[in-house]
């Protein structure tokens, strides 16, 4: 999972590979969850959803087998000002349009994501726009949740099943609408969220379970 399909010498010579980020956060919430359920053999998907965002798949032995960020922190999820996954052809296209590498990097890392779609990198502003019916605010939340769902599906396949979805960081802990949108239509995976528990959760100081009583996934 850590290798890119580029000439292997790029890895040997320049160490071009996927590294991932937010490792301390992913490791901490994974270990806390195993202790919380008194089960060291859980298959966990950890979701560090903040202004920067990443996910990780942790197998039943506690090994992280995949993570959404790669060589740099721009790969993967839609973020506050980062675009996340994007076709490399866009880089070449913008270069032909006269933009420098530094200008493209600035756009992808500081002018994209939520900021690029709504004008603000603050998820609270995006939520407020969506609540008012602003099309771009609604679009942004839908795009955000869709990207997260894609990774949940991919990681569930890589893990051969999933026992828990673990939300952490600013949006993961405090944005009930994000958790709701992410968990919607995941019943086929055994994910059922308790709407009332989810809405009432705010600034938790410890692990809080928000699954419905009949949810197979915690």
Q: Predicted segments — roles?
A:
Residues 61-62, 108, 148, 167:
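Buried hydrophobic positions in well-ordered alpha/beta secondary-structure cores of metabolic enzymes
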Residues 138, 142-162, 172-218:
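Internal helix-turn-beta structural module
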Residues 47, 67, 168, 194-196:
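Generic beta-strand/beta-sheet core signal
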Residues 25, 29, 54, 87-90, ...:
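General structural feature for long, well-ordered alpha-helical segments within catalytic domains
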Residues 49, 166-174:
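Glycine-rich beta-strand-to-loop/alpha-helix junction loops that act as flexible
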Residues 97-140:
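A mobile "lid/hinge" subdomain adjacent to the ATP/sugar-phosphate binding pocket shared
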Residues 43-47, 103-111, 164-166:
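Beta-strand segments within the central parallel beta-sheet cores of soluble alpha/beta enzyme folds
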Residues 2-96:
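Glycine-rich phosphate-binding loop of actin/hexokinase-like ATP-binding domains
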